[in-house]
Swiss-Prot record:
Belongs to the bacterial ribosomal protein bL33 family. Pfam families: Ribosomal_L33. The keyword DNA damage does not apply. This is Large ribosomal subunit protein bL33c. Transmembrane segments: none annotated. GO terms for biological process: translation. The lineage of its organism: Eukaryota, Viridiplantae, Streptophyta, Embryophyta, Tracheophyta. It comes from Cuscuta reflexa. InterPro entries: Ribosomal_bL33, Ribosomal_bL33_CS, Ribosomal_bL33_sf, Ribosomal_zn-bd. GO terms for molecular function: structural constituent of ribosome. It is found in: Plastid.
């Protein structure tokens, strides 16, 4: 019996609003909110996007998958 390739991969979700507005009024970088999760490659071949809480923005924002 042939071995199957590992279907689950680890992905990083990054806040899209923090990535666009990384510099605040004083020109100091505030950082970017990131979450680490897993996805099934066969069920979801395209990039993931979730609404998750961003502690930097203090609200629920869209978090998108980024490359490692």
């Amino acid at each position: 019996m042939a071995k199957t390739k590992n279907v689950r991969v680890t992905v990083i979700l990054e806040c899209t609003s923090c990535a666009q507005n990384n510099v605040n009024v004083n020109k100091v970088a505030t950082g970017i909110s990131r979450y680490i999760t897993q996805k099934n490659r066969h069920n979801t071949p395209n990039r993931l996007e979730f609404k998750k809480f961003c502690p930097r923005c203090y609200k629920h924002t869209l978090h998108g998958e980024i490359k490692k």
